[in-house]
């Protein structure tokens, strides 16, 4: 009898182990928060570069102008003057005199009231501030971008961005200590990307038709505190008149979970995307 009880106990324990083992095998890794939060930060940080590039490269001389959504202003003084801000065209048509006094700062100011961007969905407030020791058109010259109370819809974006032009259509972008928050949740984001303008360069005064591709990698921490890393495997495609990345793929690895392949679609401007992990494909929204 005693031997029978022992055998029964062993059988029950073995059965429990087997059941638990089967249960673990059928668990689905469907964590989407890291994928969504990377997109929330990445899409807007990367969208800043073509806006800055459009204004910096194509600005003839120095003047304060409306830039569709926002106002472009130089924050500095021409050589030999004390003018703090330039509101009209100056005699220094090529702007070289501004750089005689050292680094020059510019601002794209969306104000506190804000305005609607070309995608029809992104409402912007705050300031994008640029600081550069040389003209924007100079290659291999790092330009520092600081975000001041910069908000898109209800999300505030902060951090520093270093942009370096490699050629007429290509820049590298490094996001340092990037942070995205709506006051209820917080996301950390850093990354180094190469951005190439593949559309809109023939219309220098029209931001609405700009199109860029993005390659590179990033890391961050999602709103639930889980860290993640990413690597773009097929260039991401972003139109300035679309809020979302519309095509391309990347690999994202949340801490403690399997690497998933994120697919942003085939080019349609929408917030639909998928990720595949362990052979299973899951749909999600880029919000």
Protein language model features and the residues they cover:
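Bacterial N-terminal signal peptides that target proteins for export
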Residues: 1-9
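Basic side chains
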Residues: 2-3, 23-25
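C-terminal motif of bacterial Sec signal peptides marking the signal peptidase cleavage site
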Residues: 17-21
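Low-complexity, intrinsically disordered segments exposed to solvent
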Residues: 24-287
């Amino acid at each position: 009898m005693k031997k029978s009880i022992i055998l029964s106990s062993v059988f029950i324990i073995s059965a429990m182990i087997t059941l638990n083992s089967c249960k673990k095998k059928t668990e689905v890794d469907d964590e989407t928060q890291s994928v969504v939060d990377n997109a929330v930060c990445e899409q807007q940080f990367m969208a800043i570069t073509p806006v800055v590039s459009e204004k910096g490269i194509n600005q003839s001389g120095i003047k304060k102008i409306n830039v569709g959504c926002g106002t472009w202003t130089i924050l500095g003084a021409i050589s030999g003057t004390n003018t703090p801000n330039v509101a009209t065209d100056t005699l220094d048509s090529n702007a070289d005199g501004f750089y005689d006094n050292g680094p020059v700062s510019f601002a794209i100011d969306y104000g506190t009231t804000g305005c609607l961007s070309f995608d029809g969905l992104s409402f912007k407030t705050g300031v994008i501030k640029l600081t550069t020791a040389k003209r924007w058109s100079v290659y291999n010259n790092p330009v520092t971008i600081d975000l001041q109370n910069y908000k898109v819809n209800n999300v505030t974006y902060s951090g520093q961005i270093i942009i370096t032009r490699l050629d007429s259509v290509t820049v590298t972008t490094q996001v340092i200590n990037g942070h995205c928050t709506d006051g209820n949740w917080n996301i950390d984001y850093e990354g180094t990307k190469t951005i190439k303008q593949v559309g809109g360069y023939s219309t220098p005064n029209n931001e609405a038709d700009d199109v860029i591709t993005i390659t590179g990698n990033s890391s961050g921490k999602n709103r639930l505190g889980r860290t993640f890393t990413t690597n773009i495997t097929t260039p991401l495609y972003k139109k300035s008149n679309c809020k979302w990345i519309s095509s391309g793929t990347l690999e994202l690895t949340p801490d403690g979970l399997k690497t998933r392949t994120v697919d942003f679609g085939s080019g349609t401007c929408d917030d639909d995307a998928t990720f595949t992990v362990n052979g299973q494909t899951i749909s999600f929204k880029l919000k």
